[in-house]
Design a protein with these regions (language model features):
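Acidic/aromatic/glycine-rich contiguous surface patches that form carbohydrate-binding/processing clefts
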Residues: 241
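Extended intrinsically disordered or low-complexity regions, especially N/C-terminal cytosolic tails and loops
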Residues: 1-233, 245-335
Length: 335
């Protein structure tokens, strides 16, 4: 026999039907499988996208997938109200924009890796200078700020232990472990992720942070960590092939002289560009890589933007820069 109403007049068995209804709604909302032909027909007939070459379009969907290509890059080409493509937009333009983002990831990753390499070199040098070359030293929680960040330090040390654990697919780690029974930090850093490197810097003693930050004299050790944190997030996006052009993070780089020089607007005291978007990464690179390297980075970035705008005539420069978090005068960053 079913129970009567519970307190408040609800039936005890009502949650069962509630869960069942939720599942039903989820199933109804789930997208159905579509063949490549159906996908192209949907784009053309339902969404108004021009497809000049159906064979090329099908092969592209086979190679990239509908979700990665259309799901990831359609928004810039749609009418905000109708959610249909702007008249004249072609499939080829979306493909061109996809490849633009692909090239963007390669460009940013190239220079982020330079920052990562330099940072790892500075950390391993100054940490080893203080504590010595034994792996037990960087695996010892008390050599970090364990008092204030015990959980985070333990997590870091555990991850470092796994990085140098045997058997290792890193030949250089396996070599040192077998021959010397020790993997010094300057070897281990080569296998460390940017996330591990960022955490290592954050939780190592302040005196070592200060020494490392002297390689970047314009900023304090805390401000350097802000740069590193945002760069690490961007690196992950690049390395995992995620969408980069509209990159955003909850972390922020510090206010810089460049924000002021470029006349970036403020709202409630916060700069509206270059704090936690892709332009923030550009600013970080301006301070963290050599001047000549940054000039080359800026040149190649400018060429990528000009090239994609030529290939995507229905995409305006203002629209693209806004999505990227770039001010209109972003190229004056060197002046």
């Amino acid at each position: 026999m079913l129970e009567g109403p519970t307190a408040g007049g609800a039936h005890a068995w009502a949650p069962f039907f509630h869960i069942k209804n939720i599942r039903k709604r989820v199933y109804l909302m789930a997208q159905k499988f579509m063949t490549y032909e159906q996908q192209l027909n949907k784009l053309q007939a339902d969404k108004g996208l021009t497809i000049p070459d159906a064979d090329f379009a099908r092969k592209t969907l086979e190679e990239i997938s509908y979700y990665s290509l259309i799901g990831g890059y359609k928004d810039l080409f749609l009418h905000p109200a109708s959610k249909k493509y702007k008249y004249g937009v072609t499939f080829d333009e979306i493909v061109a924009f996809y490849h633009f983002d692909e090239q963007l990831r390669s460009l940013f990753l190239k220079y982020i890796l330079q920052v990562e390499r330099h940072l790892k070199s500075m950390i391993s040098y100054h940490f080893t200078e203080k504590y010595g070359e034994l792996q037990t030293e960087y695996l010892a929680p008390h050599n970090f700020d364990y008092i204030h960040h015990s959980k985070q330090v333990k997590r870091l040390v555990d991850s470092l232990s796994k990085t140098i654990a045997m058997p290792s697919h890193y030949r250089y780690i396996a070599h040192h472990a077998r021959k010397y029974h020790n993997v010094p930090l300057w070897v281990a850093t080569n296998a460390m992720t940017m996330g591990q490197t960022s955490a290592f810097y954050q939780y190592m003693p302040n005196d070592i942070q200060v020494k490392v930050s002297k390689a970047y004299p314009q900023y304090t050790e805390k401000q350097l960590h802000q740069f590193i944190t945002v760069i690490a997030k961007c690196r992950n996006v690049c390395a995992h092939g995620e969408r980069l052009f509209d990159f955003h993070t909850t972390d922020m780089i510090p206010d810089t002289l460049l924000h002021s020089k470029l006349g970036i607007t403020r709202k409630k005291g916060l700069y509206q560009n270059g704090k936690k978007d892709l332009f923030a990464v550009v600013i970080a690179l301006r301070y963290l890589i050599p001047n000549e390297e940054f000039k080359m980075f800026r040149k190649n970035l400018s060429l990528l933007i000009k090239d994609v705008l030529k290939k995507c005539p229905y995409l305006t420069e203002d629209q693209l820069l806004k999505e990227m978090g770039f001010p209109k005068n972003w190229a004056k960053i060197m002046r």
